[in-house]
């Protein structure tokens, strides 16, 4: 099976290169919204582009080098329920540490109350 059509391939990329975390977003000075986020940043644009194409979701952002000898990097990012959907698909391929982190985010999302604190 081709890597570009294989869930295990992309789960491996996220396991090794990705970040999973909760992001806060303050709105109207009264509420703090909390969202699960999946992010993967690297200099290989083709890999970042293939993540977006495979999962059919997310945004790609370009980052210019901060120093002359650095390369341009690209970040693919998904948040909210779509991030949870991806975690649920990929969790069986993750390492133990990543499974634990994914389960924390999934539980948070499941137990949220309109996602507002």
Regions found by a protein language model. Give the residues of each.
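Internal intein/HINT superfamily modules and their associated LAGLIDADG
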Residues: 1-117
């Amino acid at each position: 099976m081709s890597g570009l059509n294989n869930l295990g391939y992309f789960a491996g990329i996220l396991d090794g290169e990705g970040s999973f975390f909760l992001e806060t977003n303050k709105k109207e000075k009264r509420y703090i919204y909390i969202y699960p986020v999946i992010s993967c940043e690297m200099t290989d644009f083709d890999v970042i582009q293939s993540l977006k194409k495979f999962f059919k979701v997310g945004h790609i952002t370009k980052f210019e080098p901060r120093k002359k000898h650095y390369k341009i990097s690209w970040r693919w990012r998904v948040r909210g329920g779509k991030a949870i959907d991806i975690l649920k698909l990929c969790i069986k391929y993750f390492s133990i540490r990543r499974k634990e982190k994914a389960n924390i985010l999934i539980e948070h999302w499941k137990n949220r109350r309109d996602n507002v604190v």
